[in-house]
Protein backbone atom coordinates (compact mmCIF):
# COMPACT_ATOMS: atom_id res chain seq x y z
CA UNK A 1 0.00 0.00 0.00
CA UNK A 2 1.41 3.36 -1.06
CA UNK A 3 1.07 6.29 1.31
CA UNK A 4 1.88 9.95 0.69
CA UNK A 5 4.14 11.41 3.33
CA UNK A 6 5.22 15.05 3.65
CA UNK A 7 8.88 15.88 3.22
CA UNK A 8 10.94 16.25 6.34
CA UNK A 9 12.64 19.40 5.07
CA UNK A 10 12.00 22.95 6.15
CA UNK A 11 8.75 24.62 5.15
CA UNK A 12 9.07 27.74 3.04
CA UNK A 13 7.00 30.61 4.39
CA UNK A 14 6.45 33.55 2.05
CA UNK A 15 7.19 37.00 3.44
CA UNK A 16 4.32 38.76 5.08
CA UNK A 17 2.91 41.75 3.20
CA UNK A 18 3.67 44.48 2.53
CA UNK A 19 6.82 43.62 0.55
CA UNK A 20 9.12 46.41 -0.62
CA UNK A 21 8.77 46.75 -4.38
CA UNK A 22 10.91 48.84 -6.68
CA UNK A 23 8.71 50.72 -9.11
CA UNK A 24 9.52 51.38 -12.71
CA UNK A 25 10.15 55.04 -13.46
CA UNK A 26 7.23 55.03 -15.90
CA UNK A 27 4.89 54.47 -12.94
CA UNK A 28 5.60 57.82 -11.32
CA UNK A 29 7.39 59.97 -13.93
CA UNK A 30 5.11 62.17 -16.05
CA UNK A 31 6.53 62.89 -19.49
CA UNK A 32 5.86 66.12 -21.37
CA UNK A 33 5.90 67.02 -25.07
CA UNK A 34 8.96 69.25 -24.69
CA UNK A 35 12.18 67.97 -26.27
CA UNK A 36 15.67 69.45 -26.26
CA UNK A 37 18.69 68.77 -28.44
CA UNK A 38 22.21 68.75 -26.99
CA UNK A 39 25.47 68.41 -28.90
CA UNK A 40 29.03 68.56 -27.63
CA UNK A 41 32.07 70.17 -29.15
CA UNK A 42 34.53 68.15 -31.18
CA UNK A 43 36.37 66.10 -28.54
CA UNK A 44 40.01 65.42 -29.46
CA UNK A 45 42.88 63.66 -27.74
CA UNK A 46 46.47 62.91 -28.81
CA UNK A 47 49.08 60.69 -27.15
CA UNK A 48 51.38 57.68 -27.34
CA UNK A 49 49.60 54.40 -28.13
CA UNK A 50 51.58 52.15 -25.76
CA UNK A 51 52.62 54.05 -22.62
CA UNK A 52 52.99 57.43 -20.92
CA UNK A 53 56.07 59.33 -22.03
CA UNK A 54 57.59 60.83 -18.89
CA UNK A 55 60.26 63.41 -18.23
CA UNK A 56 63.86 62.43 -17.55
CA UNK A 57 63.27 62.36 -13.78
CA UNK A 58 59.95 60.48 -14.17
CA UNK A 59 57.96 63.02 -12.17
CA UNK A 60 55.96 64.54 -15.03
CA UNK A 61 53.97 62.99 -17.87
CA UNK A 62 54.99 64.82 -21.03
CA UNK A 63 52.89 62.76 -23.47
CA UNK A 64 49.88 60.85 -22.09
CA UNK A 65 48.93 57.36 -23.16
CA UNK A 66 46.16 57.45 -25.80
CA UNK A 67 45.43 54.03 -27.25
CA UNK A 68 42.67 52.77 -29.48
CA UNK A 69 42.31 49.85 -27.05
CA UNK A 70 41.24 52.10 -24.18
CA UNK A 71 37.78 52.74 -22.79
CA UNK A 72 36.46 56.27 -23.20
CA UNK A 73 34.25 57.05 -20.21
CA UNK A 74 32.35 60.32 -20.74
CA UNK A 75 30.60 62.05 -17.87
CA UNK A 76 28.03 64.34 -19.47
CA UNK A 77 26.41 66.96 -17.23
CA UNK A 78 23.21 68.78 -18.19
CA UNK A 79 21.71 71.94 -16.70
CA UNK A 80 19.16 71.65 -13.92
CA UNK A 81 15.70 71.88 -15.55
CA UNK A 82 14.21 73.16 -12.28
CA UNK A 83 16.12 76.40 -12.83
CA UNK A 84 14.66 76.98 -16.29
CA UNK A 85 12.34 79.94 -16.79
CA UNK A 86 9.26 78.11 -18.07
CA UNK A 87 6.29 80.34 -18.69
CA UNK A 88 3.71 77.57 -18.56
CA UNK A 89 3.00 76.97 -14.87
CA UNK A 90 0.93 73.89 -15.68
CA UNK A 91 4.15 72.12 -16.68
CA UNK A 92 6.29 73.17 -13.75
CA UNK A 93 4.83 74.03 -10.38
CA UNK A 94 7.65 74.05 -7.79
CA UNK A 95 5.15 73.36 -5.03
CA UNK A 96 3.94 70.14 -6.65
CA UNK A 97 6.60 68.88 -9.07
CA UNK A 98 10.30 68.57 -9.77
CA UNK A 99 11.66 68.40 -13.30
CA UNK A 100 14.10 65.77 -14.61
CA UNK A 101 15.62 64.82 -17.96
CA UNK A 102 14.92 61.62 -19.85
CA UNK A 103 17.17 60.35 -22.63
CA UNK A 104 15.20 59.61 -25.80
CA UNK A 105 18.05 59.19 -28.25
CA UNK A 106 21.76 59.61 -28.78
CA UNK A 107 24.39 59.43 -31.47
CA UNK A 108 28.07 58.82 -30.79
CA UNK A 109 29.97 60.46 -33.60
CA UNK A 110 33.46 59.29 -34.48
CA UNK A 111 35.90 60.99 -36.79
CA UNK A 112 39.06 59.69 -38.45
CA UNK A 113 39.28 56.90 -41.06
CA UNK A 114 38.98 53.22 -40.33
CA UNK A 115 42.29 51.56 -39.65
CA UNK A 116 44.04 48.66 -37.97
CA UNK A 117 46.66 49.35 -35.34
CA UNK A 118 49.16 46.77 -34.22
CA UNK A 119 50.56 46.21 -30.77
CA UNK A 120 53.33 43.99 -29.49
CA UNK A 121 56.40 43.64 -27.31
CA UNK A 122 60.11 43.72 -28.24
CA UNK A 123 60.71 40.94 -25.69
CA UNK A 124 57.57 38.83 -26.13
CA UNK A 125 57.49 35.44 -24.39
CA UNK A 126 57.27 33.26 -27.50
CA UNK A 127 59.35 30.12 -27.61
CA UNK A 128 58.42 29.04 -31.15
CA UNK A 129 55.54 28.47 -33.55
CA UNK A 130 53.44 25.38 -32.74
CA UNK A 131 51.10 25.44 -35.73
CA UNK A 132 53.62 24.16 -38.29
CA UNK A 133 56.74 23.09 -36.40
CA UNK A 134 59.63 21.88 -38.52
CA UNK A 135 62.05 20.69 -35.86
CA UNK A 136 62.38 20.24 -32.14
CA UNK A 137 63.57 23.29 -30.29
CA UNK A 138 64.88 23.18 -26.76
CA UNK A 139 64.34 26.23 -24.64
CA UNK A 140 67.16 28.42 -23.39
CA UNK A 141 67.34 30.89 -20.55
CA UNK A 142 65.91 33.67 -22.76
CA UNK A 143 63.83 32.89 -25.85
CA UNK A 144 61.90 36.16 -26.05
CA UNK A 145 61.30 37.64 -29.49
CA UNK A 146 60.10 40.90 -31.00
CA UNK A 147 56.47 40.10 -31.92
CA UNK A 148 53.57 42.31 -33.00
CA UNK A 149 49.96 41.56 -33.90
CA UNK A 150 46.60 43.25 -34.38
CA UNK A 151 44.20 43.04 -31.41
CA UNK A 152 40.70 41.68 -31.18
CA UNK A 153 38.16 43.97 -32.85
CA UNK A 154 35.82 45.62 -30.35
CA UNK A 155 32.92 48.05 -30.76
CA UNK A 156 30.85 48.74 -27.69
CA UNK A 157 29.00 51.45 -25.78
CA UNK A 158 26.99 51.50 -22.55
CA UNK A 159 24.88 54.41 -21.30
CA UNK A 160 23.44 55.03 -17.84
CA UNK A 161 23.14 57.65 -15.13
CA UNK A 162 25.87 56.06 -12.98
CA UNK A 163 29.26 54.73 -14.15
CA UNK A 164 29.58 51.45 -15.99
CA UNK A 165 30.76 48.50 -13.91
CA UNK A 166 33.62 46.28 -15.10
CA UNK A 167 35.01 42.92 -14.04
CA UNK A 168 38.47 41.36 -14.12
CA UNK A 169 40.42 38.48 -12.55
CA UNK A 170 43.04 39.18 -9.92
CA UNK A 171 45.21 37.39 -7.37
CA UNK A 172 43.19 36.22 -4.37
CA UNK A 173 44.43 36.12 -0.76
CA UNK A 174 46.04 32.85 0.26
CA UNK A 175 44.50 30.82 3.06
CA UNK A 176 46.42 30.83 6.33
CA UNK A 177 46.96 27.06 6.36
CA UNK A 178 48.09 26.90 2.71
CA UNK A 179 51.78 26.96 3.55
CA UNK A 180 54.49 28.36 1.31
CA UNK A 181 53.29 29.49 -2.13
CA UNK A 182 56.68 30.11 -3.72
CA UNK A 183 56.62 28.83 -7.29
CA UNK A 184 52.90 27.94 -7.18
CA UNK A 185 50.05 29.41 -9.18
CA UNK A 186 48.17 31.93 -7.01
CA UNK A 187 44.43 31.56 -6.41
CA UNK A 188 42.21 33.79 -8.53
CA UNK A 189 39.12 35.80 -7.70
CA UNK A 190 36.74 37.87 -9.79
CA UNK A 191 36.76 41.55 -8.89
CA UNK A 192 34.51 44.42 -9.89
CA UNK A 193 35.33 48.04 -10.40
CA UNK A 194 34.16 51.17 -12.16
CA UNK A 195 35.36 51.49 -15.75
CA UNK A 196 37.27 54.76 -15.88
CA UNK A 197 38.47 56.77 -18.82
CA UNK A 198 41.73 55.28 -20.07
CA UNK A 199 41.20 51.75 -18.75
CA UNK A 200 42.23 49.02 -21.17
CA UNK A 201 39.73 46.53 -22.53
CA UNK A 202 40.42 42.92 -23.50
CA UNK A 203 42.39 42.62 -26.74
CA UNK A 204 42.71 38.83 -26.79
CA UNK A 205 44.58 37.92 -23.59
CA UNK A 206 41.63 38.00 -21.18
CA UNK A 207 40.35 40.43 -18.58
CA UNK A 208 43.03 40.05 -15.92
CA UNK A 209 45.25 42.23 -13.77
CA UNK A 210 48.58 42.02 -15.59
CA UNK A 211 50.29 43.98 -12.83
CA UNK A 212 50.00 41.07 -10.40
CA UNK A 213 49.61 38.06 -12.72
CA UNK A 214 52.39 38.73 -15.25
CA UNK A 215 55.68 38.49 -13.39
CA UNK A 216 57.94 38.25 -16.46
CA UNK A 217 56.40 41.35 -18.11
CA UNK A 218 56.58 39.51 -21.45
CA UNK A 219 53.35 37.52 -21.71
CA UNK A 220 51.29 40.36 -23.22
CA UNK A 221 51.84 43.46 -25.33
CA UNK A 222 53.34 46.74 -24.14
CA UNK A 223 50.06 48.62 -23.89
CA UNK A 224 48.54 46.21 -21.32
CA UNK A 225 51.61 44.74 -19.59
CA UNK A 226 51.25 47.21 -16.70
CA UNK A 227 47.47 47.60 -16.84
CA UNK A 228 44.22 45.98 -15.73
CA UNK A 229 42.13 44.77 -18.66
CA UNK A 230 38.46 45.14 -17.82
CA UNK A 231 35.29 43.82 -19.40
CA UNK A 232 31.83 45.28 -18.70
CA UNK A 233 30.00 43.27 -16.05
CA UNK A 234 26.78 42.85 -17.99
CA UNK A 235 25.40 40.24 -15.58
CA UNK A 236 25.61 42.55 -12.57
CA UNK A 237 24.32 45.60 -14.42
CA UNK A 238 21.39 43.73 -15.99
CA UNK A 239 20.35 42.50 -12.53
CA UNK A 240 20.68 45.91 -10.89
CA UNK A 241 17.50 46.55 -8.91
CA UNK A 242 17.30 50.18 -10.08
CA UNK A 243 18.82 49.82 -13.55
CA UNK A 244 20.86 53.03 -13.39
CA UNK A 245 24.21 51.75 -14.64
CA UNK A 246 23.01 50.42 -18.00
CA UNK A 247 19.91 51.72 -19.77
CA UNK A 248 20.93 49.81 -22.87
CA UNK A 249 24.12 48.80 -24.62
CA UNK A 250 25.38 47.76 -28.03
CA UNK A 251 28.44 45.63 -28.68
CA UNK A 252 30.21 43.88 -31.51
CA UNK A 253 33.32 41.76 -30.99
CA UNK A 254 35.18 39.52 -33.40
CA UNK A 255 38.50 37.73 -33.58
CA UNK A 256 40.19 34.60 -34.83
CA UNK A 257 43.39 32.79 -33.90
CA UNK A 258 46.05 33.96 -36.32
CA UNK A 259 49.21 32.41 -34.82
CA UNK A 260 49.69 29.53 -32.39
CA UNK A 261 52.68 29.85 -30.09
CA UNK A 262 54.06 28.24 -26.96
CA UNK A 263 55.49 29.99 -23.92
CA UNK A 264 59.06 29.78 -22.80
CA UNK A 265 59.97 28.76 -19.26
CA UNK A 266 59.22 25.83 -17.01
CA UNK A 267 55.78 24.23 -17.18
CA UNK A 268 53.98 24.94 -13.92
CA UNK A 269 51.42 22.14 -14.19
CA UNK A 270 53.16 19.13 -15.71
CA UNK A 271 51.30 16.53 -17.74
CA UNK A 272 49.96 13.91 -15.26
CA UNK A 273 51.79 10.99 -16.89
CA UNK A 274 55.14 12.48 -15.99
CA UNK A 275 54.13 14.08 -12.70
CA UNK A 276 51.88 11.63 -10.83
CA UNK A 277 52.35 8.36 -12.80
CA UNK A 278 48.97 8.18 -14.55
CA UNK A 279 49.93 4.95 -16.41
CA UNK A 280 50.31 6.47 -19.87
CA UNK A 281 46.87 8.03 -20.08
CA UNK A 282 48.10 11.10 -21.93
CA UNK A 283 51.08 9.95 -24.04
CA UNK A 284 53.38 7.01 -24.71
CA UNK A 285 57.07 7.67 -24.02
CA UNK A 286 59.82 6.87 -26.48
CA UNK A 287 63.49 6.15 -26.01
CA UNK A 288 64.47 8.92 -28.42
CA UNK A 289 62.34 11.55 -26.65
CA UNK A 290 63.01 11.41 -22.97
CA UNK A 291 62.04 15.03 -22.28
CA UNK A 292 58.84 16.70 -23.42
CA UNK A 293 58.74 20.15 -24.93
CA UNK A 294 56.80 23.01 -23.41
CA UNK A 295 53.00 22.57 -23.41
CA UNK A 296 51.91 26.11 -22.45
CA UNK A 297 50.11 26.93 -25.68
CA UNK A 298 48.43 30.22 -26.53
CA UNK A 299 47.21 32.03 -29.65
CA UNK A 300 47.65 35.58 -30.83
CA UNK A 301 44.30 36.71 -32.15
CA UNK A 302 43.42 39.03 -35.00
CA UNK A 303 40.46 41.34 -35.34
CA UNK A 304 40.20 40.55 -39.04
CA UNK A 305 38.45 42.86 -41.50
CA UNK A 306 37.48 46.40 -40.48
CA UNK A 307 34.59 47.67 -42.57
CA UNK A 308 32.12 50.54 -42.51
CA UNK A 309 29.22 48.12 -43.05
CA UNK A 310 29.31 46.99 -39.42
CA UNK A 311 29.71 50.25 -37.52
CA UNK A 312 27.88 51.06 -34.28
CA UNK A 313 28.91 54.71 -34.40
CA UNK A 314 27.79 57.70 -36.47
CA UNK A 315 24.21 56.42 -36.38
CA UNK A 316 21.29 57.25 -34.06
CA UNK A 317 19.91 55.02 -31.32
CA UNK A 318 16.46 55.58 -29.78
CA UNK A 319 15.54 54.54 -26.26
CA UNK A 320 11.99 53.21 -26.10
CA UNK A 321 12.25 50.78 -23.21
CA UNK A 322 15.31 50.30 -21.01
CA UNK A 323 16.32 46.87 -19.77
CA UNK A 324 15.96 47.87 -16.10
CA UNK A 325 13.53 49.81 -13.94
CA UNK A 326 15.04 53.14 -14.96
CA UNK A 327 13.66 53.98 -18.38
CA UNK A 328 16.21 56.62 -19.26
CA UNK A 329 15.71 59.07 -16.38
CA UNK A 330 18.91 61.06 -15.76
CA UNK A 331 19.11 61.42 -12.01
CA UNK A 332 21.24 64.36 -10.86
CA UNK A 333 21.22 65.67 -14.46
CA UNK A 334 24.13 63.55 -15.65
CA UNK A 335 24.79 60.66 -18.00
CA UNK A 336 27.73 58.30 -18.30
CA UNK A 337 28.64 57.10 -21.79
CA UNK A 338 31.27 54.33 -21.86
CA UNK A 339 32.73 53.63 -25.30
CA UNK A 340 35.19 51.02 -26.62
CA UNK A 341 36.17 51.17 -30.28
CA UNK A 342 39.42 50.08 -31.93
CA UNK A 343 38.23 50.13 -35.54
CA UNK A 344 39.94 53.53 -35.92
CA UNK A 345 43.20 52.30 -34.47
CA UNK A 346 45.76 53.76 -36.85
CA UNK A 347 49.02 54.77 -35.16
CA UNK A 348 50.92 57.62 -36.79
CA UNK A 349 54.64 57.14 -37.53
CA UNK A 350 56.51 60.45 -37.34
CA UNK A 351 60.19 60.67 -38.24
CA UNK A 352 62.57 63.55 -37.50
CA UNK A 353 66.31 64.08 -37.93
CA UNK A 354 68.23 63.62 -34.72
CA UNK A 355 70.84 66.29 -35.53
CA UNK A 356 68.97 68.45 -38.03
CA UNK A 357 71.66 68.21 -40.72
CA UNK A 358 70.96 64.80 -42.24
CA UNK A 359 70.99 64.80 -46.06
CA UNK A 360 71.36 61.12 -46.90
CA UNK A 361 69.39 58.34 -45.31
CA UNK A 362 71.06 57.05 -42.18
CA UNK A 363 68.89 55.08 -39.77
CA UNK A 364 71.17 56.01 -36.89
CA UNK A 365 70.44 59.71 -37.44
CA UNK A 366 66.65 59.45 -37.70
CA UNK A 367 64.30 59.25 -34.74
CA UNK A 368 60.91 57.56 -35.07
CA UNK A 369 57.94 58.60 -32.95
CA UNK A 370 54.44 57.14 -32.60
CA UNK A 371 51.22 59.00 -31.91
CA UNK A 372 47.55 58.04 -31.78
CA UNK A 373 44.62 60.45 -32.13
CA UNK A 374 40.92 60.09 -31.39
CA UNK A 375 37.91 62.22 -32.29
CA UNK A 376 34.44 62.11 -30.74
CA UNK A 377 31.22 64.10 -30.77
CA UNK A 378 28.17 63.31 -28.62
CA UNK A 379 24.57 64.24 -29.50
CA UNK A 380 21.47 63.68 -27.37
CA UNK A 381 17.70 64.10 -27.51
CA UNK A 382 16.31 64.93 -24.06
CA UNK A 383 12.68 64.86 -22.97
CA UNK A 384 11.48 67.09 -20.16
CA UNK A 385 9.70 65.11 -17.43
CA UNK A 386 8.23 65.94 -14.07
CA UNK A 387 7.92 64.01 -10.83
CA UNK A 388 5.05 64.67 -8.40
CA UNK A 389 6.10 65.48 -4.84
CA UNK A 390 4.09 62.69 -3.26
CA UNK A 391 5.03 60.72 -0.18
CA UNK A 392 5.23 57.33 -1.89
CA UNK A 393 7.36 58.66 -4.73
CA UNK A 394 9.75 60.58 -2.49
CA UNK A 395 10.15 57.58 -0.19
CA UNK A 396 11.34 55.39 -3.06
CA UNK A 397 13.67 58.07 -4.42
CA UNK A 398 15.15 58.59 -0.95
CA UNK A 399 15.76 54.85 -0.57
CA UNK A 400 17.40 54.76 -4.00
CA UNK A 401 19.60 57.86 -3.63
CA UNK A 402 19.01 60.43 -0.92
CA UNK A 403 21.29 62.86 -2.73
CA UNK A 404 18.57 63.44 -5.34
CA UNK A 405 16.26 64.98 -2.74
CA UNK A 406 19.10 67.10 -1.41
CA UNK A 407 19.72 68.50 -4.88
CA UNK A 408 16.00 69.26 -5.10
CA UNK A 409 16.30 71.13 -1.79
CA UNK A 410 13.98 68.65 -0.15
CA UNK A 411 14.56 66.71 3.03
CA UNK A 412 12.88 65.00 5.92
CA UNK A 413 12.22 67.19 8.95
CA UNK A 414 14.16 65.77 11.93
CA UNK A 415 12.61 65.34 15.34
CA UNK A 416 12.98 68.39 17.60
CA UNK A 417 16.08 68.38 19.77
CA UNK A 418 15.35 69.73 23.25
CA UNK A 419 18.81 69.19 24.68
CA UNK A 420 20.81 72.15 25.94
CA UNK A 421 23.91 73.04 23.92
CA UNK A 422 27.05 74.68 25.22
CA UNK A 423 28.41 77.88 23.69
CA UNK A 424 31.81 79.12 24.78
CA UNK A 425 33.10 82.68 24.68
CA UNK A 426 36.70 83.55 23.82
CA UNK A 427 37.29 80.51 21.62
CA UNK A 428 40.89 81.56 20.92
CA UNK A 429 41.74 81.78 24.62
CA UNK A 430 44.17 79.25 26.10
CA UNK A 431 41.82 78.83 29.03
CA UNK A 432 39.03 77.51 26.77
CA UNK A 433 38.93 74.12 25.12
CA UNK A 434 39.75 73.81 21.46
CA UNK A 435 36.85 74.76 19.20
CA UNK A 436 34.92 71.96 17.56
CA UNK A 437 35.86 71.06 14.03
CA UNK A 438 33.73 72.86 11.49
CA UNK A 439 32.01 70.33 9.22
CA UNK A 440 32.70 70.61 5.52
CA UNK A 441 29.72 72.30 3.89
CA UNK A 442 30.80 71.40 0.35
CA UNK A 443 28.94 68.39 -0.98
CA UNK A 444 31.15 65.42 -1.78
CA UNK A 445 31.06 64.10 -5.32
CA UNK A 446 30.21 60.37 -5.14
CA UNK A 447 32.24 59.75 -8.32
CA UNK A 448 35.02 62.24 -7.67
CA UNK A 449 37.60 59.51 -7.03
CA UNK A 450 37.25 58.17 -10.57
CA UNK A 451 38.66 59.52 -13.82
CA UNK A 452 36.18 60.52 -16.54
CA UNK A 453 36.19 62.69 -19.62
CA UNK A 454 33.94 65.51 -18.40
CA UNK A 455 31.61 67.03 -21.00
CA UNK A 456 29.62 70.09 -19.91
CA UNK A 457 26.29 70.58 -21.71
CA UNK A 458 25.10 73.51 -19.61
CA UNK A 459 24.98 75.86 -22.61
CA UNK A 460 24.47 73.32 -25.40
CA UNK A 461 20.69 72.74 -25.25
CA UNK A 462 18.29 73.92 -27.94
CA UNK A 463 14.57 73.62 -28.61
CA UNK A 464 15.09 73.94 -32.38
CA UNK A 465 15.44 70.26 -33.14
CA UNK A 466 15.11 70.77 -36.89
CA UNK A 467 18.39 72.72 -36.93
CA UNK A 468 20.50 69.67 -36.06
CA UNK A 469 21.04 66.33 -37.83
CA UNK A 470 20.00 64.17 -34.87
CA UNK A 471 17.03 66.43 -34.18
CA UNK A 472 15.74 66.08 -37.74
CA UNK A 473 16.08 62.30 -37.54
CA UNK A 474 14.12 62.30 -34.29
CA UNK A 475 11.35 64.48 -35.70
CA UNK A 476 11.02 62.25 -38.74
CA UNK A 477 10.97 58.90 -36.94
CA UNK A 478 8.62 60.07 -34.17
CA UNK A 479 6.09 61.68 -36.50
CA UNK A 480 6.41 65.11 -34.92
CA UNK A 481 7.53 66.61 -38.22
CA UNK A 482 4.31 65.60 -39.94
CA UNK A 483 2.29 66.92 -37.04
CA UNK A 484 4.00 70.30 -37.26
CA UNK A 485 3.54 70.42 -41.01
CA UNK A 486 -0.17 69.68 -40.75
CA UNK A 487 -0.61 72.56 -38.34
CA UNK A 488 0.71 74.98 -40.95
CA UNK A 489 -1.83 74.19 -43.62
CA UNK A 490 -2.74 77.38 -45.42
CA UNK A 491 -6.44 78.25 -45.87
CA UNK A 492 -7.33 79.35 -49.39
CA UNK A 493 -9.90 82.10 -49.96
CA UNK A 494 -12.96 81.03 -51.89
CA UNK A 495 -13.41 82.81 -55.23
CA UNK A 496 -16.46 85.07 -55.60
CA UNK A 497 -19.03 83.74 -58.01
CA UNK A 498 -20.05 86.16 -60.69
CA UNK A 499 -23.79 86.33 -61.53
CA UNK A 500 -25.03 87.97 -64.70
CA UNK A 501 -28.58 89.03 -65.25
CA UNK A 502 -30.11 88.41 -68.66
CA UNK A 503 -31.84 91.51 -70.01
CA UNK A 504 -35.14 90.64 -71.54
CA UNK A 505 -35.57 92.36 -74.90
CA UNK A 506 -38.79 94.21 -75.53
CA UNK A 507 -40.86 92.88 -78.33
CA UNK A 508 -41.64 95.51 -80.95
CA UNK A 509 -45.05 95.61 -82.56
CA UNK A 510 -45.79 97.25 -85.80
Curated annotation (Swiss-Prot):
In Swiss-Prot or TrEMBL terms, this protein is called Major capsid protein L1
SUPFAM superfamilies linked to this entry: Group I dsDNA viruses (SSF88648)
**Region annotation Disordered: residue ranges?**
126-147, 488-510
Q: Which UniProt keywords apply?
A: Capsid protein, Disulfide bond, Host nucleus, Host-virus interaction, Late protein, T=7 icosahedral capsid protein, Viral attachment to host cell, Viral penetration into host cytoplasm, Virion, Virus endocytosis by host, Virus entry into host cell
Task: Provide the organism lineage as a comma list.
Answer: Viruses, Monodnaviria, Shotokuvirae, Cossaviricota, Papovaviricetes
An example GO biological process term is: endocytosis involved in viral entry into host cell
Principal place of residence: virion
Q: Which organism is it from?
A: Human papillomavirus 22
Q: Which residues cross the membrane?
A: none
Q: Where in the cell is it found?
A: Virion; Host nucleus
What's the gene?
L1
Which protein family is it in? Answer: Belongs to the papillomaviridae L1 protein family.
Which InterPro entries does the entry mention?
Capsid_L1_Papillomavir, Capsid_L1_sf_Papillomavir, dsDNA_vir_gr_I_capsid
Reported function: Forms an icosahedral capsid with a T=7 symmetry and a 50 nm diameter. The capsid is composed of 72 pentamers linked to each other by disulfide bonds and associated with L2 proteins. Binds to heparan sulfate proteoglycans on cell surface of basal layer keratinocytes to provide initial virion attachment. This binding mediates a conformational change in the virus capsid that facilitates efficient infection. The virion enters the host cell via endocytosis. During virus trafficking, L1 protein dissociates from the viral DNA and the genomic DNA is released to the host nucleus.
Share what the entry says about its subunit structure, partners included.
Self-assembles into homopentamers. The capsid has an icosahedral symmetry and consists of 72 capsomers, with each capsomer being a pentamer of L1. Interacts with the minor capsid protein L2; this interaction is necessary for viral genome encapsidation. Interacts with protein E2; this interaction enhances E2-dependent replication and transcription activation.
Q: Known Pfam families for this protein?
A: Late_protein_L1
Give one GO term, molecular function aspect: structural molecule activity
Q: Does the keyword Disulfide bond apply?
A: yes
What's an example GO cellular component term for this entry? T=7 icosahedral viral capsid
Q: Where is the composition biased (Basic residues)?
A: 490-510
Amino acid sequence: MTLWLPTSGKIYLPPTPPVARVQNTDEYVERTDIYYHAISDRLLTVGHPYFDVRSSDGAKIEVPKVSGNQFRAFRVTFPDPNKFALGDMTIHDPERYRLVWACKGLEIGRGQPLGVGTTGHPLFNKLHDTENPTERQEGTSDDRRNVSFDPKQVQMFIIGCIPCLGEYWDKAPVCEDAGSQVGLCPPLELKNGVIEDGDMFDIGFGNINNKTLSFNRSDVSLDIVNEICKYPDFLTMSNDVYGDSCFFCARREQCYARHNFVRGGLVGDAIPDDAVQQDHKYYLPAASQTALENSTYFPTVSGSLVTSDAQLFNRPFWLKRAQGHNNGILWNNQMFVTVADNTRNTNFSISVASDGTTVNYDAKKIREFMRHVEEYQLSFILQLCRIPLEAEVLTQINAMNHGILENWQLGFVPTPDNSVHDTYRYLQSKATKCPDAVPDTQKEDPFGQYTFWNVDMSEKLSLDLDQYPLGRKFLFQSGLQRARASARVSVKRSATRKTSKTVKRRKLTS
